[in-house]
């Protein structure tokens, strides 16, 4: 099915990428999922747009199925859609003003106020409420390296804090590794990881979905 998507995430996943955005016809999130990889990560041959990486705010026509995987290994996500064969085509770009209508403002980010959520919490909800992607307006962003990886602490305009979440936005990681300055206010695409259990002796919650900074759009974009 031909689907026009505002790209709001191009992030690291299993050595490849996770792409996500808003279906402009429905206003709903979609996450294209490959049929040819073990965890749905999208290889370059499927995600490329005229030989280039999809960029945040690109308007892209994608061929997506009506359905996708929704099981435990995908954190029971409602947004997943299988990728069908037609190549993706960019035909323009959205502005920051265009995406504001899609901002989430609930008092929890992705089902909890902590940096993770148990998949069972999502599974217990109707499919229409099993969100694993959100766009949030951020009034303060801090980024630091820990264990060789970039971590983000952010405060939304609603006053919700998320501390020490992993940064998976590929472009932002490149900027940080290059020593570039980043704007500390903007719009964050927040996503849930595939469930995994941290190697901690006192951890007793099993595999959980971890919140990720999957896309960062500076306020001045």
Task: Place the predicted regions along the sequence by residue.
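N-terminal ordered "arm"
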Residues: 1-58, 62
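Small/flexible residues
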Residues: 19, 33, 37, 115-117, ...
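Exposed beta-sheet edge/beta-hairpin loop segments within beta-rich domains
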Residues: 53, 141-144, 180-181
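A structural signal for short, hydrophobic beta-strand segments that form beta-sheets
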Residues: 1-12, 32, 137-140, 205, ...
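Short amphipathic beta-strand and strand-loop transition segments with alternating hydrophobic
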Residues: 6-11, 131-146, 192-196
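OB-fold/S1-family single-stranded nucleic acid-binding modules
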Residues: 55-58, 63-133, 148, 153-176, ...
